[in-house]
Amino acid sequence: MIQQQQQFDCVELDELYWFIERKNTEKACKNIYVITMVSRQPRQILGFDVAFDKTSERIQKIINDAAEAEKYCTDGYYGYLGVIYTGKHIYNIHNKKDSFTVEGVNADLRHYIPTLARRSRCFARKLENLRAAISVFVHAYNKFGLAKYHYRLTHKKKEVPFSIIDFI
């Protein structure tokens, strides 16, 4: 993971699930989970894990491996309870207003990685292959996100939009 800062203001956690080999319509027995941890400013993926389960221990490892944040925002999944530092957890079970950034990153993951697209015929054959694809995506996403963040800090005018040309 690329981490440029020591501490972040707000970090969001969420998970998405998908399948290995094929989509089982009767019972999703080979679900895999992609757990992501994203900072709001600058928008970076601070940690992720790809696994067959989404246990509290797995979530705790992602949190421990990243820099500490002022507050942590999550959705209604019970696995987040008790793993985040006391007094720093915003647990919103009713809506996604506190986890909009990580939901957007998960949408980007589904958009840019064909094996995570909802109506796709592409499926990862191995967990390691999906983990490697997400790792490459995270590296490029963080690099582009930091370039965009620094560009916006130096160019305050709204007439000067950030583009891929500025990144290259």
Regions found by a protein language model. Give the residues of each.
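Residue-level recognition of single "structural anchor" positions
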Residues: M1-I168
